[in-house]
Design a protein with these regions (language model features):
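Nucleotide-sugar-dependent glycosyltransferase catalytic domains
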Residues: 1-177
Length: 177
């Protein structure tokens, strides 16, 4: 994607702050991340969104952002079937880590000699590997948790529900469509 750049300036104060985002590729995580991107962009930040191939955002809806695709190893002509959401998130983290490291290094190198400066990575709290990569590369990092209070309560109750045998649900089948 081609970006329009402001005229170069010799002062560090004129450097454009650039925020890097990496949402978990589920709608309940993508939407809040893009809302945050909109707020940051309105306050003068340039925005780069890293995204997986799985459930990739429609880049034409956000022409003001730069998008960097990260191969996830779970999409494509022969996607890996992972029915357990937690297992899928863990698989996604593992599959994206090396490719994200490569792409993040590329973005950082691109901005090292320009008027843009990458100030931080904001990753979904479930994208643990991406946070670790940012840490290893010296990029300040923040995490965004998109769940609400009810979701937090479920997370707290999950171990107890497993201990009592309520989860995972046994003997349940879906009606054929």
């Amino acid at each position: 994607m081609t970006r329009t750049r402001p005229a170069p300036s010799s002062t560090a104060a004129a450097r454009r702050r650039h925020v890097l985002l990496f949402p978990l590729p589920y709608q309940g995580h993508i939407t809040p991340m893009f809302r945050l991107a909109g707020i940051l962009h309105a306050r003068g930040f340039a925005v780069t969104v890293f995204h997986t191939q799985f459930n990739a955002p429609d880049t034409s809806r956000h022409p003001e952002y730069r998008f960097v695709a990260v191969p996830d190893g779970l999409s494509g002509p022969a996607p890996v079937a992972v029915n357990d959401v937690v297992a899928r998130i863990l698989a996604l983290n593992g599959a994206c880590e090396a490719a994200f490291r490569e792409r993040l290094k590329g973005v950082l190198e691109e901005y090292s000699g320009e008027d843009d400066v990458a100030c931080c990575l904001i990753a979904d709290v479930h994208m643990l590997s991406m946070v670790e990569v940012a840490k290893q590369l010296g990029v300040p990092k923040l995490t965004l948790r998109t769940g609400n209070a009810a979701c937090f309560t479920v997370f707290l109750a999950y171990p107890m529900l497993c201990e009592k045998g309520y989860l995972p649900v046994q003997g349940m089948s879906l009606d054929p469509v």
